[in-house]
């Protein structure tokens, strides 16, 4: 409603409800006491500062003072809000004695009921409510015209305090009684009131979202001191009211096209039928938004009491818990089998894989984030990657973690882009400015981001999360927007091996399509291999049948899901310090890892660097948090070192049976192996006795090499052959070595180790079978034959192909 000018003497309608509420609220500010003194005297004194204009009032205090006043504020909040602000201005002016008129505002906190974004309906318009959600988009700060001063262009009358209804609003009529101007007004910018204004968008959290539904979103309007107080990815509670605003984006859409050569005069009929605005016509394009008066970070609940998680400590949590909750946490911390009981409660439907469960459990607790003197941030979150064959419960691990953790985001690598994982720069529908929209890593800030099918991601998308995994920030420089955003999240990834099955004869890096920088940023790698084991298969089948037959009774848990979540939230607040003994053990264990990496011919899955030392520190701190300890002890370091070994050591390699590839060879080598004895140390033999027709006995000798001997021998052959190829290329002759030349060269190298003719024959057969495996199985060596189109060859072709030229595959890289 327009406020009348006193000089003109125009009448104003008296608002009895607003005036009565203003008087009651001012009495509340002047009379409400806490601990014997008026509570809001000191906060009101702080409003004397030029950059402060909002007084925060606890709604619980209003309910204690007058229940009728609290009911009136809740039900008629938008109606009485200007009167509440006027009472705050009067109270501040009386208490401080301000000589200038300063507009003050009120912000309510601790509103009892919290609503979800999905529950916002038109019935809540104008009432005081509190909603919670996750910020997914933030807009830049703009000035907003709140109260305008206009000048009539017909009679030059000044019209003050014209309230703006969420869009530019002209006075309905000139205040001068002798002037009936309704359209021709000009805004006086110097005498108008502007406030800072920021628009953000929040959406439902993952925990509140019904399964299979699209998250609902709502726009939040922040004013004055609230601007730039929220960040994309964080979760907040917003207190305010639901309003209806004109949909400017629809109004700004282009209408009919401009026609050239119109018969009308210039400027005539530009607005269609004129005069309808004077009759009260309004556009019907509106949408709902939320006008916030206070913002608080979303908090965890203990005993029904909220605590700000950014400033909370373990002692604060203890004070806010009930006696039963505290006794249960204390009992759990003294449990000798707490480590095992927690993984049983977290993953009751998954059989086995206890090491993976322990690693994920320590990821939930996390390490301690630190900041050096040079302001360099050291991450405390633990990153875990699970690599395994299909049907080894990889996705089940991720699903259960995303359901359990309160701040967890589940996404698939193949269906996610770089912008969807980090952050996107999009154009605003109304102002057409570029704004930042949070991705999965930002939405999982201070939580866990579960990425399934991690190996299916494009290479450019993997590169986009390098910074987020180590520095825990996301830097954006696109479309004129430059920003560094927080991504303090742990990453739990699942990947499938190349070709679907994990090849034990290859290293971890050769089994997955991940770059070395990405692999080094994971603290733990767990390899799950689907093996045929009668005992394990029976136990897994029994577990699955029990789950399908009776889901509730088949799961035995020492603690409930809520108790585990409460314990994890409480234990995460500890910040253990590394003691002198634990630090000494960390240094010694890191030295052992480095020595073993350089001295065991590639027994590790990847190169041991300082990042593995930092991983050991984070795991040790997580173990200390699990026990609610303020110091990292030696047993914590020992368990972290053992768990890290599970991922650093290569999966135990099986022996190489050279005779397994006889069917791929040109010649069947069975008859050549009869009556052959192997007395050398390089290979072991196994004798199979085959009875044919009960009379004759055929013995087949099988050559078996350990994986390490196989790699050393094949590397020696490849390096020699490449050296010969390089020499032949320089001399200009045919490149490559004949098969017989390779065998002869090897026998010359081991001539001093051969003591008998039988051993010479054994060595010769061994190297020939090794060459066959490198040709037909590993495809490291390429035979240059004259005819390889058919396996049935004539005598002439057979004689030519018995001793082909051998060359190393040009794409083969020696480990």
From Swiss-Prot:
Disordered, as annotated region: 672-693
List of residues binding ADP: 611, 614
Binding site for ATP: 391-395, 496
Assigned keywords, A-Z: ATP-binding, Cell cycle, Cell division, DNA replication, DNA-binding, Helicase, Hydrolase, Metal-binding, Mitosis, Nucleotide-binding, Nucleus, Zinc, Zinc-finger
Pfam hit, one: MCM_OB
C4-type Zn finger ranges: 152-179
Function: Acts as a component of the Mcm2-7 complex (Mcm complex) which is the putative replicative helicase essential for 'once per cell cycle' DNA replication initiation and elongation in eukaryotic cells. Core component of CDC45-MCM-GINS (CMG) helicase, the molecular machine that unwinds template DNA during replication, and around which the replisome is built. Acts as a component of the MCM2-7 complex (MCM complex) which is the replicative helicase essential for 'once per cell cycle' DNA replication initiation and elongation in eukaryotic cells. Core component of CDC45-MCM-GINS (CMG) helicase, the molecular machine that unwinds template DNA during replication, and around which the replisome is built.
Protein's UniProt name: DNA replication licensing factor Mcm6
Organism, scientific name: Drosophila pseudoobscura pseudoobscura
Gene that this polypeptide is encoded by: Mcm6
């Amino acid at each position: 409603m327009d406020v009348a000018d006193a000089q003109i003497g125009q009448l104003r309608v008296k608002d009895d409800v607003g005036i009565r509420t203003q008087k009651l609220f001012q009495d509340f500010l002047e009379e409400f006491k806490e601990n014997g003194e008026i509570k809001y005297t000191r906060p009101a004194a702080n409003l004397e500062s030029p950059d402060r204009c909002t007084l925060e009032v606890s709604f619980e205090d209003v309910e204690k003072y007058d229940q009728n006043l609290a009911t009136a504020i809740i039900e008629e909040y938008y109606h009485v809000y200007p009167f509440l602000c006027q009472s705050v201005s009067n109270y501040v002016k009386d208490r401080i004695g301000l000589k200038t008129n300063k507009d003050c505002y009120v912000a309510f906190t601790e509103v009892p009921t919290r609503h979800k974004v999905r529950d916002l309906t038109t019935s809540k318009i104008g009432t005081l409510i509190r909603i919670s959600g996750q910020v997914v988009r933030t807009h830049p700060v703009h000035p907003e015209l709140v109260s305008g001063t206009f000048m009539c262009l017909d009679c030059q009358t000044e019209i003050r305090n014209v309230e703006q209804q969420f869009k530019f609003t002209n006075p309905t009529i000139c205040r001068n009684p002798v002037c009936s101007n309704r359209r021709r007004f000009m805004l006086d910018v110097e005498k108008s009131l502007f406030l800072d204004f920021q628009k953000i968008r929040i959406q439902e959290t993952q925990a509140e979202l019904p399964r299979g539904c699209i998250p609902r979103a709502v726009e939040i309007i922040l004013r004055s001191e609230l601007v730039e107080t929220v960040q994309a990815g964080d979760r907040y509670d917003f207190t305010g009211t639901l309003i209806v605003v004109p949909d400017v984006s629809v109004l700004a859409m282009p209408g009919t096209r401009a026609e050239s050569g119109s018969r009308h005069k210039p400027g005539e009929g530009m607005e269609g039928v004129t005069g309808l605005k004077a009759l009260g016509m309004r556009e019907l394009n509106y949408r709902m938004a939320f006008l916030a008066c206070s913002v608080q970070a979303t908090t965890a609940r203990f005993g029904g009491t909220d605590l700000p998680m950014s400033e909370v400590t373990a002692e604060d949590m203890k004070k806010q818990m009930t006696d039963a909750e505290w006794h249960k946490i204390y009992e759990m911390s003294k449990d000798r089998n707490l480590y095992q009981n927690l993984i049983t409660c977290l993953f009751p439907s998954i059989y086995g894989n206890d090491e993976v469960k322990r690693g994920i459990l320590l990821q939930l607790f996390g390490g301690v984030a630190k900041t050096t003197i040079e302001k360099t941030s050291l991450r405390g979150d633990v990153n875990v990657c699970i690599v395994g064959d299909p049907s080894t419960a990889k996705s089940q691990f991720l699903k259960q973690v995303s359901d359990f953790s309160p701040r967890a985001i589940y996404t698939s690598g193949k269906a996610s882009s770089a912008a969807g994982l980090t952050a996107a720069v999009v154009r605003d529908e109304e102002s057409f400015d570029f704004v930042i929209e949070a991705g999965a890593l930002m939405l999982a800030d201070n939580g866990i981001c579960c990425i399934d099918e991690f190996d299916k991601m494009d290479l450019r998308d993997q590169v986009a999360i390098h910074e987020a995994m180590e520095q825990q920030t996301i830097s954006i420089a696109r479309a004129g927007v430059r920003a560094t955003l927080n991504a303090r999240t742990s990453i739990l990834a699942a990947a499938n091996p190349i070709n679907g099955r994990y090849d034990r004869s290859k290293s971890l890096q050769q089994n997955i399509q991940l770059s070395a920088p990405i692999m080094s940023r994971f603290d733990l790698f767990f390899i799950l291999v689907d093996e045929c084991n009668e005992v394990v298969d029976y136990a897994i089948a029994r577990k699955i049948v029990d789950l399908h037959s009776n889901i509730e009774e088949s799961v035995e848990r020492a603690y409930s899901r809520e108790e585990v979540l409460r314990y994890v939230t409480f234990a995460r607040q500890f910040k253990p310090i590394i003691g002198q003994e634990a630090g000494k053990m960390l240094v010694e264990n890191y030295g052992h890892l480095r020595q073993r990496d350089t001295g065991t011919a590639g027994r590790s899955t990847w190169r041991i660097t300082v990042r593995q030392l930092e991983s050991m520190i984070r795991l040790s701190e997580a173990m200390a948090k699990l026990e609610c300890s303020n110091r990292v002890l030696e047993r914590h370091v020992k368990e972290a070192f053992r768990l890290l070994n599970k991922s650093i050591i290569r999966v135990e390699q099986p022996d190489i049976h050279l005779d397994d590839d006889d069917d791929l060879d040109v010649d069947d080598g069975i008859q050549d192996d009869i009556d052959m004895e192997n007395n050398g140390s390089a290979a072991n033999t196994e004798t199979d006795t085959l009875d044919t027709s009960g009379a004759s006995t055929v013995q087949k000798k099988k050559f078996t090499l350990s994986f390490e001997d196989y790699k050393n021998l094949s590397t020696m052959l490849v390096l020699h052959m490449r050296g010969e190829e390089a020499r032949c290329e320089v001399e200009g002759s045919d490149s490559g070595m004949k098969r017989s030349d390779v065998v002869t060269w090897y026998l010359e190298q081991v001539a001093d180790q051969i003591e008998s003719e039988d051993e010479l024959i054994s060595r010769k057969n061994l190297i020939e079978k090794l060459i066959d495996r490198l040709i037909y199985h590993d495809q490291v060596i390429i035979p240059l034959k004259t005819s390889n189109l058919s396996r049935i060859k004539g005598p002439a072709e057979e004689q030519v192909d018995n001793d082909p030229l051998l060359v190393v595959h040009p794409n083969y890289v020696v480990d």
